[in-house]
Curated annotation (Swiss-Prot):
Interacts with SMARCB1, SIN3B and DDX4. Interacts with piRNA-associated proteins TDRD1, PIWIL1 and PIWIL2. Interacts with TEX19. Disulfide bonds: none annotated. One of its GO terms (cellular component) is P granule. Pfam families: HMG_box_2, Maelstrom. This is Protein maelstrom homolog. Residues 4-73 bind DNA.
Amino acid sequence: MPNRRGSRNAYYFFVQEKIPELRRRGLPVARVADAIPYCSADWALLREEEKEKYSEMAREWKAAQGKDAGPWEKQKPVSTPLRRPAMLVPKQNVSPPDMSCLSLKSDQALLGGIFYFLNIFSHGELPPHCEQRFLPCEIGCVKYSLQEGIMADFHSFINPGEIPRGFRFHCQAASDSSHKIPISHFESGHDQATVLQNLYRFIRPNSGKWPPIYCKSDDRARVNWCLKYMAKSSEITQDLELVTVEDLVVGIYQQKFLKEPSKTWVRSLLDVAMWDYSSNTRCKWHEENDILFCALAVCRKIAYCISNSLATLLGIQLTEAHVPLQDYETSNSVTPKMVVLDAGRYQKLRVESSGFSHFSSSNQEQRSNTPTGDYPSGVKISGQSSSVRGRGITRLLESISNSSSNIHKFSTCESSLSPYMSQKDGYKSFSSLS
């Protein structure tokens, strides 16, 4: 009997691709076998055409090993832990976005189309045998168009509810390794029903059917689960159509430019770090605490990347609503050879000068950012001014620029004193000049 221990199928390559993400969450994943229990739910949410990518990888591997892959057949995951039927995550019936409804033959219709980018953060991911897989703690949503850029955004912290017994340390460790949102006694957290209703009010169309909501493919399983979980505690439920933003970008290129980019290229387009410390990207709480992971920042960076990619192709004039242009101007003024950051000192100074904690300042943000119209709590219109600036490298570059101007003034002053300098002694004291 041939040895089949070395056989690799589509699920093997899917798990192998998910390992870096699992490690970022703080999960103890050293090899593929360790990651298998954490990937079964995400695998179940994939469509058949998405699984075909990993099936092709398996066939290529078998061909390289001198094996005959044979006719294509559906690959089944190996070593997938069994769960009760009630605990299975329902398979999401999501089809690729229907780009024909946007009438992409008309440039004006494409530029004026409205898109919503959504992301929900959780206090880690519980094992597959748990009925509650995620604990939602933060939500961010952005209203975007290619013509106007970011038109409005919605952000709110979520009260995750009771932590499942025995998983408090697991959830705390996952939070500390990413968004660092406290798992309990967080004053800025709102109940799940209120947050979901405010989200519905933010994306509710004036007429017609509800628009599709876009998120990254790596986050779709978590976002979809959290939406359904939060809907259980809300009186008003709406079955939102959740589509991957990768499909949106592929659809735009395919319909408008008659070419279809690969999903790998699109993912590399969206997963960039150049916007991580840009101004007005993160929420105020994450900005003040100098924390990189933020649900609102994920949505905003999607808009930045799409604007940056399609601006020249569609003739879009970039504005502050498309990308943070002021950071470009600042970063191009000075190019230091070495950068030393002391974020702790600046953090201490900001706390002492403000006179209140980060939690109370976040509450003030919630109140100050709430418009007086029909917009729900957490909604901010792009036209409103904001005092939040980028931390770290942006402020350092500005200080270096100011220091350069001061050095120039000093050199001018030194030149004016040159007649008083003695060639023999090299200098004279100012007292001797009198």
